């Protein structure tokens, strides 16, 4: 009995050690991603993008810009939304099968890895890392770092607000409630019925997109989007979200991060043009994104 208990305790310690190592490595990569964002920037410090009153005015302006974007969409934008919705509906029809396949292949090791990446997508972690970047930018007088930090938080907050409202309105049951993927309880404040869309996916993609948009380093873009993808997929693995929840949440986060970044570029326009362009003479489909 004691031998079995010691073995169990030893296994638990090993798993915790492995998880700590994975967490440390992941956070180190994320920190590299953030601190590398301002590399190569030749802009001087104009004194903008600081923790002052302008921060709140800018947030209000940008939130309005994101929220009102659909009012400025045209036919091409409708095609883009239709394409994303189509993929989402396709995943929705297979959500139950995907969930069963993933859950049937979970292992203690995959649980450890998924828990690390799920931690990466936590809002508090993302805000904390943005805070580190802002502090470095403030100390070293790097406006690009401060800008990326503040826009990252702005994108995260905007995504969180829009996602929470959608979650409550839709009221989709989470996989771990043992309800089917077609179970809904609209206007529910029960966390078990706030599966769609994934808040983790929306938040981490909003931040990753902001970092990528401000970065001049390709490696940073790759790392940011890779971490965002793994963090999002971990929610399917952990049985907290259906595949369609994660896909739509990721798309929402991406476009929010993209929109807010472009609203804060010199000479940026406040309208968005997203669409599919069909080439002449063939059925080629091209995604065009214009801000």
Which residues are covered by each model-predicted region?
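Alpha-helical transmembrane segments
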Residues: 81-85
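Alpha-helical transmembrane segments of multi-pass membrane proteins
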Residues: 87-96
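Interfacial/capping segments of alpha-helical transmembrane domains
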Residues: 95-106
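Cytosolic-side membrane-entry/anchor segment at the start of a transmembrane helix
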Residues: 106-114
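Well-ordered alpha-helical segments within folded domains of soluble proteins
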Residues: 129-133
């Amino acid at each position: 009995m004691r031998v079995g208990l010691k073995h169990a305790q030893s296994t638990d310690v090993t798993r915790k050690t492995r998880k700590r190592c994975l967490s440390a490595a992941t956070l180190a990569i994320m920190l590299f991603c953030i601190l590398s964002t301002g590399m190569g920037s030749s802009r001087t410090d104009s004194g903008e993008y600081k923790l002052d009153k302008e921060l709140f005015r800018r947030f209000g302006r940008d939130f309005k810009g994101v929220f009102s974007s659909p009012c400025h969409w045209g036919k091409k934008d409708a095609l883009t939304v239709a394409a994303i919705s189509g993929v989402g509906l396709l995943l929705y029809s297979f959500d139950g099968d995907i969930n069963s396949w993933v859950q049937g292949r979970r292992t203690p090791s995959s649980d450890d890895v998924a828990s690390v990446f799920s931690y990466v997508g936590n809002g508090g972690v993302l805000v904390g890392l943005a805070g580190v970047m802002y502090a470095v930018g403030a100390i070293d007088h790097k406006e690009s770092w401060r800008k990326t930090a503040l826009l990252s938080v702005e994108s995260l907050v905007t995504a969180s607000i829009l996602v929470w409202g959608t979650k409550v309105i839709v009221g989709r049951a989470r996989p771990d409630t043992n309800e089917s993927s077609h179970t809904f309880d609209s206007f529910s404040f029960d966390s078990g019925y706030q599966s769609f869309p994934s808040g983790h996916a929306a938040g981490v993609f909003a931040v990753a997109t902001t970092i990528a948009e401000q970065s001049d380093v390709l490696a940073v873009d790759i790392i940011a989007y890779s971490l965002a993808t793994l963090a999002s997929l971990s929610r399917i693995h952990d049985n907290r979200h259906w595949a369609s929840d994660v896909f739509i949440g990721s798309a929402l986060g991406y476009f929010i991060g993209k929109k807010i970044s472009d609203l804060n570029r010199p000479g940026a326009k406040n309208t968005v043009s997203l669409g599919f362009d069909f080439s002449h003479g063939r059925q080629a489909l091209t995604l065009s994104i214009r801000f």
